[in-house]
Amino acid sequence: MRVAFLVDSVSNLKESQAQHLYVLPLFIIESTPEAETTFSSGFDIDLKTLTDKMANAPKGVKFSTSQTTEEIVRAKVSELVEQYDLIIGIPIDKEISASYANWKLVEKDYASKFHVLDARAVEMIIDWLINDIKGWLNTNPYSREGLDRFVEQYRKKTAAVLFVTDTKPLVAGGRLSNLKSFIIKSLKFHLLISFLGENGKLQFFDKARSAHDAHKLAVKFLKKQLLKHSAKLKRGAFLTTVFDEQTNTNLVQEFDKLLDHSINIEQSLLSPVICTHTGLNSYVIVLQGE
């Protein structure tokens, strides 16, 4: 059976026909008082370009995001069904974006070949999921029910914490109140936002006066959540909007120490579409249980 994977910009993956991996754009909108410019995240705007724009944006310039349209999904799927027996779709987490609904509309018309997963995943978690699905397909006959059950269990084993100091994008996107933002900024707190694969929701859960204290709180929280479902941790990832290599190396080493050197921590840049909401100098620690 020929299988392809279809994802979107939030995966931060590059399209590869050799790997049977295809990527659809999510969009970043730069709004000025005079006009709007739309970019395809990961296609015609990368993280460095976006963060430079955000850092140097004059007053009145705003950045927002937009979903993948039904028409874009439909066009790609209609092309892929001619080449593959099964297309597995993994769109951005439905708790973060309405894009998932557009994918499901297209799925109805290609039900025998297009399977959209309720993965509630973003970033590196999607890459891990693709690899684990490939392993599952090697040892299990494909069925919608079987793969959905596998993904439901997978979700329980993934979690992340986002570290934020620039709260303006979160306020603009309605994900943080002005009052909380004012308190955090005034007292120079580090804001911690959790992401649990089990429910796919982003939730403010704590704050800390120092980065080190924030990191300790995050690791404690993640281990508590994941070790309810797993005997031990399997892998980790550090995702960043920071371009200073030494800063990133120091952060990875700190997380490695807090995790007792128990897992390998991959390192990658955060996707532009997520950075639009998390702001400058944000970073994420992602963990997965066995």
From Swiss-Prot:
Residues involved in hexadecanoate binding: 65, 97
Domain DegV residue range list: 3-289
PANTHER family associated with the record: DEGV DOMAIN-CONTAINING PROTEIN DR_1986-RELATED, FATTY ACID-BINDING PROTEIN TM_1468
SUPFAM superfamilies linked: DAK1/DegV-like
Keyword annotations: Lipid-binding
A Pfam family annotated for this UniProt entry: DegV
Organism: Mycoplasma pneumoniae (strain ATCC 29342 / M129 / Subtype 1) (Mycoplasmoides pneumoniae)
Described purpose of this protein according to its UniProt entry: May bind long-chain fatty acids, such as palmitate, and may play a role in lipid transport or fatty acid metabolism.
Upper lineage: Bacteria, Bacillati, Mycoplasmatota, Mycoplasmoidales, Mycoplasmoidaceae
InterPro entries: DegV, DegV_C, DegV_domain_contain
GO molecular function terms listed in the Swiss-Prot or TrEMBL record: lipid binding
Protein's UniProt name: DegV domain-containing protein MG450 homolog
